[in-house]
Amino acid sequence: MTNLKSKALDFTQNFVIALDGPAASGKGTIGFMLAEKFSLKYVQSSIVYRQLAFNCIKEKIDITDINKVISLSKEINITDKFDLEDENIGGVASQIAVIAEVRDNLNKHLVKLINTTPRILMEGRDIGTIVAPNADFKIFITANPEVRAERRYKQLQAKGKACILDEILQQIILRDKRDKEREVAPLLPALDALIIDTSKLSPLSVVEQIMQFILKE
């Protein structure tokens, strides 16, 4: 039995999975399903960025005032829960994520959580490269922008939120550009990550593919 397979199946062992990918690539659904399969705590790192964005909007903080944003990033409570799926919040989160000091402050919360949680799957954009470079297993999920926009459109419609497909597509393209081109922790797969394009795959088929890789002898 491989060491990876042993850690995955023995729930008494520490096991850390880093799952990265762009917006609406399907990593959330896939991550949740994988976490259930291997008895892992499932954490979306984006929650701290979206929560900071929510706080900036709520407190009417101009996100170009970097010092105020940095100061606010020190006070994030990772246990707070809000409905943060709004695309405007996601856009603000992507903008403040380029600030090095903000990423440092928020990543400290995430690293602490990983270090104090024996079995965890953390999903985000730089988990395998920055937050948890020593994770036991790294996955990078992607899909073409049109497919991702359609997925997000359906998600928002299901929640009864008004949305326009083309606007969502343009927001995703803009966020991709910002995430990939930022100087601090740009969006890219770790060198040792398993890369999967989900454009034509169901979440279940992706999970099965990942499980086959983890559980192979």
Curated annotation (Swiss-Prot):
Enumerate the Gene3D superfamilies for this protein. P-loop containing nucleotide triphosphate hydrolases
Which InterPro entries does the record associate with it?
Answer: Cytidylate_kin, Cytidylate_kinase_dom, P-loop_NTPase
Localization terms from the record: Cytoplasm
Q: Under the GO molecular function aspect, what terms does this record hold? A: ATP binding; CMP kinase activity; dCMP kinase activity
Top-level taxon in the UniProt lineage = Bacteria
Q: Which GO terms describe its biological process?
A: pyrimidine nucleotide metabolic process
The record's GO CC annotations read: cytoplasm
Where, by residue number, does ATP bind? G21, P22, A23, A24, S25, G26, K27, G28, T29
Give the reaction(s) catalysed: CMP + ATP = CDP + ADP; dCMP + ATP = dCDP + ADP
Entry's Pfam families? Cytidylate_kin
Keyword Cytoplasm in the entry? The reply is yes
Tell me which UniProt keywords the record has, alphabetically: ATP-binding, Cytoplasm, Kinase, Nucleotide-binding, Transferase
The EC number of this protein is 2.7.4.25
Q: What class of enzyme is it?
A: transferase
Q: Which family does it belong to?
A: Belongs to the cytidylate kinase family. Type 1 subfamily.
Q: What is this protein called?
A: Cytidylate kinase
Q: Which gene encodes it?
A: cmk
